[in-house]
Amino acid sequence: MSILGVIPGIHVAAPRDAGTLAEELREAVAISDAPSVIRYPKASVGADLPALERVGSVDVLRRSGTDVLLVTVGALGELGLEAAQRLEDQGIGVTVVDPRWIYPMSVDLVEMAASHRLVVTVEDGGRHGGFGSALAAACATPTSRSRCATSRCRNGSTTTASVERCWRCAASPRRTWRAA
């Protein structure tokens, strides 16, 4: 997915489930002034994950505080919710969001990030140049108090991994919290 970010004006959707795939497909077809791409998993998707609310262009999947903002990309939404539960069990307030559209970067997401101590992206792309890197760059302002971290499957050449492998590779709640 990181290579798509260099295409000027591109719109890239990463649906989290079948429901958002249908919705984002309709939105992609309506884009007439730029290229659009929908990135979906090759495996079957899990159950639909309903949003609590939509803030601008961002779906909020869970909200219990502003210590950590977990930004889940695509089908990793359920894993983000599981990680949030683990953090909440340790007394850490978490907001889990799905940006829906990876590119262009959502101003709404950048504003959400500014109100959290730590921002963690959960994605299955490469270490460099992915969505997490783009979000960290967008959030890097002189007045920002948020720290950004990424959780990815692997660093190196483009390969594929199962969702279970991505979860095993993700940072533990303890290591994530220490990063703050």
Question: Each PLM stretch: what is its role?
Answer:
Residues M1-A28:
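Conserved thiamine diphosphate
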Residues A30-A180:
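Thiamine diphosphate
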